[in-house]
């Protein structure tokens, strides 16, 4: 019984750090592309203004480093540089494919009684390997 109590006590700092971090970022997370979203899906949520981040994604077949900036609470811009394994770089037999690109996201409507609405462009200035355009809505239920 004492070992279970000690184990639960050891989890308290973890829960405190999680609470503080999630509260300071309004429950937003970076997705695989380095922008606010869930896994590989963008959301209409944004970090507070003047929040900047660096993300490193190590998946298969691609790895990606992304620099993201939120100069305003309604605008997000990011620059990414991926390495795609198994796809040869043109003219180099033993080199993986490299790319670069930029992402933009702009909020059109803030969340209230209706969902937040944003539009975005992925990889609009690169080779277009990750290219996409989207309109997305997000609505939080009970601050989730």
Regions from the PLM with identified roles:
Residues 137:
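Conserved, mostly hydrophobic/aromatic
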Residues 1-33:
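Cleavable N-terminal export/targeting peptides
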Residues 23-132, 140-143:
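Transmembrane beta-barrel domains of Gram-negative outer membranes and organellar outer membranes
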